[in-house]
Design a protein with these regions (language model features):
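Conserved RNA-binding domains used in RNP assembly and mRNA/RNA metabolism
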Residues: 1-87
Length: 87
């Protein structure tokens, strides 16, 4: 597959503060995180999008290997935008 770069905006679970015990009222202020991830989409279906930010290309310029992939549930995805990397 030829590499195409995408920006994925998505919501992630958030919580578990590292500041110790907190009041219930303070914990109720915890919101989901807004995330931006960029990479090559290796797979996408109704359940998930598999995004890989680091890829190795073969001699033909096709994606051969990858590292640091993330599977994001589609219900969490806000938008997917292809980036034009050729000017």
């Amino acid at each position: 597959m030829k590499p195409r770069l995408f920006l994925v905006r998505w919501k992630d679970a958030c919580g578990g503060s590292r500041s110790g015990w907190r009041s219930v009222e303070e914990m109720k202020e915890t919101k989901e995180a807004s995330v931006m991830s960029m990479g090559v989409i290796l797979h996408q279906d109704k359940q998930r999008i598999l995004l890989c930010p680091h890829v190795l290309l073969d001699d033909k310029g096709d994606v051969e290997e990858g590292d640091a992939e993330i599977a994001i549930p589609m219900d969490w995805v806000m938008s997917v935008e292809e980036w034009n990397t050729h000017g």
